UniProtKB/Swiss-Prot annotation:
GO biological process, one term: translation
Family matches, as SUPFAM superfamilies: Class II aaRS and biotin synthetases
Protein name: O-phosphoserine--tRNA(Cys) ligase
Annotated positions binding substrate: H186, M187, T188, S231, A232, S233, Y273, Y274, N317
Broad enzyme group: ligase
PROSITE patterns linked: AA_TRNA_LIGASE_II
Gene3D superfamilies attached to this UniProt entry: 6.10.250.3340, 6.20.250.20, Bira Bifunctional Protein, Domain 2
Top-level lineage group: Archaea
Catalytic activity: tRNA(Cys) + O-phospho-L-serine + ATP = O-phospho-L-seryl-tRNA(Cys) + AMP + diphosphate
Cysteine disulfide links: none
Record family assignment: Belongs to the class-II aminoacyl-tRNA synthetase family. O-phosphoseryl-tRNA(Cys) synthetase subfamily.
UniProt gene name: sepS
Molecular function (Gene Ontology), one example: tRNA binding
HAMAP family from the UniProt entry: Sep_tRNA_synth (MF_01674)
Length: 537
């Protein structure tokens, strides 16, 4: 907390002095907590759900009402809608199946098996029979069976499960039996049911839409087909409705997603639930992608199918695959990777990788941490001293009643050199997935590397960590360790940097894995010629 009154008094006496001196009150974050190692974290929506919401709003803007169509459809409805074609259509449907409920009796043999487990049945026989009978009749849910058996016999649930496994093996041998119910393979099967029920409840014409999941038994999933997908479908019912309504709706809907110019081409499939010569494929031009794309299908339902549902007016239906539109909007090449990104490789951008490059060792004590900045400034200021030369920094630290006098001596004894090597001011950048050390100046850099390094500096992400910064933190971290362990002296020598660890840096395993898998590089090589002796008294 600031001492506000003292600051105001200081400012009243000498504003300029107060303005400069109070800057020290704003404490800088420690290196591993500073930018770019801290980065904003945003929630992320899924492209399919984004597209669903955009489609919902697009339909609503066009005056449609939203409905949820049945997901479970009886196969009889498929026959009513498709006629003779139904058998071929049902091949792509998933049927719902369930386990039958076995007629399990409580024979003398079963009672004997239970009693061999050390459980007396005689007093509880009637209760146990009622439970087994209730399960067979469907009045008792399967997931309650073990609990009810345990309660009836006054035993633990673990023992109840053992009885179910060992005495009633019939439950383990059950095989699912298919019903006549299917999972909706396309939205049309639900529209017939919905429109039929609304005919006497809503004034004509009416416009409905539904965006929901469908299930299709594909032979295999590939980059453009999944066994479950979302259909964004609409239906318009009323006198005078025809394929012109389909064309207008297609244009109105898809123009909201950046498409311009539309082609309407007769669909060769000719599904029997559509009136002949009305089933139409919609191709739209996307100026950003500069190509024509098939994006929707529409048609007018056949009077034959409509009549079976008590519908006596034309109904136009248009549908499009949400995943298809999301792939176009997001420029995805594989629907599987778009829908299930968690099962595919996650690519980190340069900004993300830069946030994962951190100092390995950092002093904990504030006094020693603060010494690091002084050390860095002195090294930068004196880096070009001609050898033989040395730079000495002395500090006294107080820890309660104990004082420690520290003498740090940075030196170069060999003649004809500088105090520190030419790479000492190199800074770590992340560029095109690579982690590289880039010099402050490109003087003397070989032409074959110069263009890459220049691009790295102008287009890459700077970590704001120089070699000298990281090395000085390594030095003060060792100093802190020496003070704590009562070590009187130590040396640090780093002649040539070959890896991140040589300059006290580390990188997150996630980033490292990507760098290796993408054949990217970590190249921080360079001469720093750091020689240090530290004495503590």
């Amino acid at each position: 907390m600031f001492k506000r009154e003292e600051i105001i008094e200081m400012a009243n006496k000498d504003f300029e002095k107060a303005w400069i001196e109070t800057k020290d009150l704003i404490k800088a974050k420690k290196v591993n907590e500073s930018y770019p190692r801290i980065k904003p974290v945003f929630g992320k929506t899924h492209p399919v759900n984004d597209t669903i919401e955009n489609l919902r709003q697009a339909y609503l803007r066009m005056g449609f009402e939203e409905y949820i169509n049945p997901v479970i459809v009886d196969e009889r409805d498929i026959y009513k809608q498709f006629g003779p074609e139904a058998m071929a259509v049902l091949d792509r449907c998933f049927y719902l199946a369930g386990l039958p409920r076995p007629d399990v009796g409580l024979s003398d043999e079963k009672i004997s098996q239970i009693e061999k487990l050390g459980i007396k049945v005689s007093e509880h026989k009637e209760s146990l029979q009622k439970i087994l009978h209730g399960y067979k009749k469907g009045t008792l849910d399967g997931d309650d069976l073990v609990l009810e058996i345990s309660n009836a016999l006054e035993i633990s649930s673990e023992m109840g499960l053992k009885i179910l496994e060992e005495v009633f093996p019939e439950f383990k041998d059950l095989t699912a039996v298919s019903s006549k119910l299917t999972l909706r393979s396309h939205m049309t099967s639900g529209w017939f049911l919905t429109v039929s029920d609304l005919m006497n409840k809503k004034p004509l014409p009416f416009k409905l839409f539904s965006i929901d999941r469908c299930f299709r038994r594909e032979q295999k999933e590939d980059k453009s087909h999944l066994m479950t997908y979302h259909s964004a479908s609409c239906a318009i019912a009323g006198e005078g409705v025809d394929i012109n309504d389909g064309k207008a709706i297609a244009e109105g809907l898809l123009s909201q997603f950046g498409f311009t110019n539309f082609k309407f081409i007769p669909d060769e499939k000719k599904s029997k639930y559509y009136t002949p010569e009305t089933q139409t494929e919609v191709y739209a031009y996307h100026p950003k992608l500069k190509e024509w794309l098939e994006v929707a299908t529409f048609g007018v339902y056949s009077p034959v199918a409509l009549s079976k549902y008590g519908i006596d007016v034309p109904v136009m239906n248009l549908g499009l695959g949400v995943e298809r539109l999301a792939m176009i909007s997001g420029n995805f090449a594989d629907v599987r990777e778009m829908v299930y990104p968690q099962f595919y490789e996650h690519k980190l951008d340069d900004r993300a990788v830069a946030s994962m490059v951190k100092l390995d060792k950092v002093p904990v004590m504030d006094e020693i941490y603060d010494l690091t900045k002084e050390l860095i400034d002195s090294c930068v200021k004196n880096k070009d001293l001609k050898s033989p030369c040395e730079l000495t920094i002395e500090k006294t630290f107080s820890f309660g009643k104990t004082k420690k006098n520290v003498k740090i001596n940075i030196f170069e004894k060999e003649e004809g050199k500088n105090l520190l090597g030419p790479s000492i001011l190199n800074e770590i950048y992340v560029y095109d997935g690579n982690v590289i050390g880039i010099p402050e100046s490109f003087d003397g850099v070989k032409e074959e590397f110069k263009e890459f390094l220049e691009k790295g500096k102008s287009e890459g992400v700077a970590t704001s960590i120089r070699y000298i910064d990281a090395l000085c933190f390594k030095l003060t971290s060792k100093l802190e360790e020496a003070i704590v362990t009562n070590t009187s002296e130590f040396k640090v020598k780093v002649p040539i940097v070959r890896s991140l660890s040589d300059i006290n840096l580390k990188i997150d395993d996630i980033a490292l894995k990507q760098i290796m898998s993408k054949n990217k590089v970590i190249d921080v090589r360079g001469p720093v010629f750091l020689n240090v002796e530290v004495k503590i008294e």
